[in-house]
């Protein structure tokens, strides 16, 4: 009986401490981190609204925002040049342009972003960057138990991609689903639309340029969109970066995924280590991409969904909301991959 009493007292104390941390004004910075991290993941924002009022959540969102880039993308700035070069602008340029012997498709770099381990992949030919999609979308009316979602490691094997990262968001009540958020465009056709409203579309045109556009799926296709998904925010447009409202750097800290393109057409996949509450902030991600020559860039789904696969191996360590490792990566619905062109593959194997 005494043991039970002590256990109940311990539970009561723990609950009291949790409420103290969640609501006491002296822990406001930690509370801000909890809210901004939950909102940032886009699929776990219910956590913020469970513990805090809409007014409190909105207060944090407003403080953590950065001003959107007021630029219409100009793809004429992108002049694709896939030939090897031996002159460099700086050390970052040299790191990208110095190709690994025997690998004309991509280069993998292990770097730091905001003090966190990170992975950068430079893909030399943007025509080899294709949208990855899971086996099926919306296989059941119960969004929590859709069976069509797929881990990036399995997507890459099934679709023949040597490199793959996760992409857009999806409906998630804690169990995941196979229902994408927003639009999905594949081979110039809308294969999924959550609604008919304009969204932040991230994709590649028929001439293999990264197009960042606020539009409906059909509007994007009219502008030459080949493959696209919906997510955001846009991080760099025409070399212009956002202005931040506070010193936090926007969107708090978390594991990050971003896609970018340099003016020479080289595509960058950036994936960082972290959790839902630890990892680079958005400014640190942007600064890193700028260093490596990104001219246009966008944020992709981070947190637990964060995945980079190279040659069938998961390169990062995805962690769930509790900080535990997610073996093999989380099941998602979209991503971006390097699928080698058959002609180039034939040339390099002769």
Where are these regions (language model features)?
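Extracytoplasmic
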Residues: 116-118, 147, 158-160, 197-199, ...
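General beta-strand structural signal in soluble alpha/beta enzymes
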Residues: 163-167, 212-213, 237, 296-300
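Active-site-adjacent helix-turn-beta-strand microarchitecture at beta-sheet edges
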Residues: 170-246
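Conserved hydrophobic/aromatic beta-strand scaffold that supports enzyme active sites
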Residues: 118-122, 201, 234, 258, ...
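Zymogen propeptides
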Residues: 2-193
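Conserved, well-ordered active-site substructure
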Residues: 175-195, 244-296, 300, 305-350
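Structural signal for glycine-centered tight turns and loop->strand junctions in beta-sheet-rich domains
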Residues: 127, 208-210, 265, 304
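Short, solvent-exposed aromatic-acidic interface loops
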Residues: 135-140, 216-220, 272-276
């Amino acid at each position: 009986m005494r043991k039970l009493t002590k256990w109940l007292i311990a539970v009561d104390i723990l609950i009291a401490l949790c409420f103290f941390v969640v609501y006491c004004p002296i822990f406001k910075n930690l509370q801000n981190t909890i809210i901004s991290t939950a909102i940032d993941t886009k699929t776990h924002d219910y956590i913020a609204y469970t513990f805090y009022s809409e007014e409190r959540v909105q207060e944090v969102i407003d403080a953590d925002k950065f001003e959107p880039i007021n630029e219409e993308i100009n793809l004429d700035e992108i002049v694709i040049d896939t030939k090897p070069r031996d002159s460099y602008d700086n050390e970052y340029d040299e790191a990208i342009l110095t190709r690994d012997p025997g690998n004309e498709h991509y280069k993998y770099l292990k770097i730091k972003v905001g003090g966190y381990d990170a992975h950068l992949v430079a893909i030399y030919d943007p025509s080899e960057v294709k949208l990855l999609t899971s086996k099926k979308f919306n296989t059941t009316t119960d969004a929590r138990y859709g069976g069509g979602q797929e881990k990036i490691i399995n997507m890459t094997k099934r679709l023949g991609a040597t490199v793959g990262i996760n992409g857009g968001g999806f409906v998630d009540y804690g169990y995941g689903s196979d229902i994408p958020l927003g639009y999905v465009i594949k081979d110039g056709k809308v294969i999924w639309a959550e609604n008919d409203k304009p969204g932040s579309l991230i994709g590649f045109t028929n001439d293999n340029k990264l197009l960042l556009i606020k539009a409906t799926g059909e509007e994007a296709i009219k502008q030459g969109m080949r493959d696209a998904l919906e997510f955001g925010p846009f991080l760099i447009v025409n070399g212009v970066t956002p202005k931040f409202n506070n010193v936090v750097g926007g969107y708090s800290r978390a594991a990050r995924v971003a896609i970018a393109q340099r003016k020479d057409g080289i595509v960058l996949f950036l994936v960082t280590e972290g959790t839902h509450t630890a990892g680079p902030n958005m400014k640190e991600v942007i600064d890193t991409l700028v260093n490596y020559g990104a001219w246009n860039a966008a944020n992709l789904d981070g947190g637990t969904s964060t995945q980079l696969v190279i040659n069938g191996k998961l390169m990062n360590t995805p962690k769930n909301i509790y900080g535990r490792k997610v073996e093999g990566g989380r099941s998602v619905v979209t991503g971006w991959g390097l699928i080698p062109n058959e002609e180039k593959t034939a040339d390099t194997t002769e």
